[in-house]
Design a protein with these regions (language model features):
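Short glycine-aspartate micro-motif
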Residues: 8-12, 62-64, 137-141, 147
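Short glycine-rich, Thr/Ser-proximal phosphate-binding strand/loop in the N-terminal lobe
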Residues: 2-49, 91, 155-183
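Short beta-strand scaffold segments in enzyme catalytic cores
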Residues: 18-22, 69, 146-152
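Short, well-ordered amphipathic alpha-helical segments that serve as non-catalytic structural scaffolds
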Residues: 45-58, 191-197
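Glycine-rich phosphate-binding loop plus the immediately following alpha-helix
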Residues: 18, 99-123, 155-195
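Proline-aspartate-enriched helix->loop->beta-strand connector
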Residues: 60, 196-205
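Glycine-rich phosphate-binding loop and adjoining helix at the ATP-binding site
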Residues: 44-52, 62, 71-130, 176
Length: 205
């Protein structure tokens, strides 16, 4: 297979839905977007199985997965909303948090599928796709919750899972900047987004 013909499976594992499509090496979309609801609570085994089935059904030769939690050196540090009983806004399951901690999902999925798989934080993955490659860049993702990535001259820098961090009014950033808050009161949501960006810029800019 020529490099230009290679099909890469791109997976965006979000708090409420899992989206995937085949793309070329150059980023051209090659297939319709597939979408399914995110299972909750979600164990590491469920995560691996869902991605494995998708790889098998597409015949992709490589896979990139955006993970909705904090990762360090390829291992899971924080689970985001995956270890919650029913998704965002529901209680965490401590035992499931521990089962996630330290998992090398790239290695596990590569072993399960027989193809090269890379799993990184979803905001970091977005940054790699849209970063300009120079200066200090702050990339913020907004959806069900929020994520943050920092790049300096095109290189990813360590960044926390800001979605779980508390806000001054007693919420966390996932709650304050997520889609539910936007749908409830967009004026307040816009103000909250502006204040969050100003705060993060003062820290990372």
């Amino acid at each position: 297979m020529m490099e230009g013909d290679e099909q890469i499976l791109a997976v965006d594992w979000g708090a409420t839905s899992v989206k995937s499509a085949l793309v070329s090496v150059g980023g051209r979309v090659l297939s319709p977007l597939k979408r399914r609801r995110t299972p909750h609570p979600c164990s590491p085994e469920t995560f691996v199985e869902v991605v494995r089935r998708r790889v098998e059904s597409t015949g992709a030769s490589r896979v990139g997965v955006g993970f909705p939690g904090e990762m360090r050196e390829g291992r899971v540090v924080g689970t985001g909303n995956l270890a919650r009983v029913g998704g965002p806004g529901t209680p965490l399951i401590p035992e499931l948090v521990e089962r996630w901690r330290g998992r090398d999902l790239s290695r596990e999925l590569s072993a399960e599928t027989g193809v090269e798989v890379r799993v990184i934080n979803d905001a970091a993955l977005a940054a790699l796709g849209c970063g300009g490659g120079y200066g200090v860049e702050l990339i913020v993702t907004l959806g069900t919750g929020c994520g943050l990535a920092v790049m300096v001259n095109g290189e990813l820098q360590p960044a926390p899972d800001v979605g779980t961090h508390p806000t001054p009014d007693g919420r966390n950033f996932d709650e304050a900047l997520g889609e539910r808050s936007r749908a409830k009161d967009e004026v307040r949501w816009r103000d909250d987004v502006r204040r969050a960006l100003e705060g993060w810029r003062s820290v990372y800019g």
